[in-house]
Regions:
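Hydrophobic beta-strand scaffold residues
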Residues: 29, 99, 131-132
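Conserved active-site and cofactor/substrate-binding residues in soluble primary-metabolism enzymes
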Residues: 8, 12, 16, 67, ...
Length: 270
């Protein structure tokens, strides 16, 4: 018996999940919820680059909630709307449908997230008799689960440093690259990703998760953000980066244990 699955938000990440649901022999795609008029009405298969599968995208989330999907993959963009995304997922849970999501990154480790985000989800999951799971690669595997697994073959650990290096030159979400990250913008541009506290909100729970897994506790987290302008102009597949505009950024979180820098997480984006 196939598990009936709906996908909400076939964006840069959701379209990958959509294709995986379609291809999996034990999953049946029942619904596809979208936000844009450009995607509404189009076949789910078309949106992920394959033949038609007979499921048309819709902007009517309520219809999906009233349908027979057992699980909803929630992948709608949430960087600028985390509480709205939580409200969406609460509605899914209260409708008696399980949620698997990659949208609100810190919820990978909910124990380190403000209760304004976690309490509504817990209450809704209990009310609906269903489950809620947030996962991903970063976070969800590479910078949290993998370091903890590798720690099992270590005798002594003084510190752990996780570094993600990512080339955004071909990233399909232009808003994320040029507005949220602020690439191609002048140094004085107030990029969301460079706003103090944003990186700590998104990835601070990673440090707490690793610390807890190793039986210790973080006292404080320090955040630093460095932004580097381009020395010369160049083009990428998604746009032009003029000389003097931002072309790279390093965001660093340092978790202190008893005053000692013990856990460090770097994101090097360019």
């Amino acid at each position: 018996m196939s598990i009936k699955v709906a996908v909400w938000g076939p964006g840069s990440m959701g379209v990958i999940a959509l294709r995986a649901v379609i291809d999996h022999p034990e999953l049946q795609l029942t619904d596809l919820v979208v936000h844009s008029d450009a995607k509404a009405g189009r076949d789910a298969g078309e949106l992920c680059g394959i033949g038609a599968v007979g499921v048309a995208a819709t902007k009517d989330a309520a219809a999906m909630l009233d349908g027979d999907a057992e699980v909803v993959v929630y992948a709608a963009a949430a960087n600028l709307r985390p509480l709205e995304a939580v409200a969406d997922m609460v509605s899914i849970l209260r409708a008696g449908k399980n949620v698997v999501s990659c949208s609100v990154v810190p919820l990978v480790y909910p124990n380190a997230v403000d209760s304004a985000f976690t309490d509504p989800l817990r209450d809704a999951a209990l009310a609906g008799g269903v489950s809620f799971f947030t996962t991903g690669i970063d976070s969800g595997f590479a910078n949290d689960v993998l370091p903890l697994a590798l720690s099992g073959v270590s005798r002594n650990i003084d510190s752990i440093r996780m570094t993600e290096m990512f080339n955004y030159g071909t990233y399909p979400d232009r808003a994320a690259v040029y507005e949220i990250l602020g690439f191609g913008q002048p140094p004085e541009f107030a990029a969301f990703a460079a706003t103090p506290g944003v990186f700590t909100f998104g990835w601070g729970p990673v440090l707490h998760q690793i610390a807890t897994g190793l039986g210790t506790r973080i006292d404080d987290i320090a955040e630093t953000v460095e932004r580097i302008p381009a020395e010369e102009s160049f083009d990428t597949p998604t746009g032009h980066i003029a000389a003097g505009t931002i072309a790279a950024m390093r965001s660093t979180l340092t978790g202190y244990v008893d005053g000692t820098p013990t856990f460090v997480l770097d994101h090097v984006s360019r």
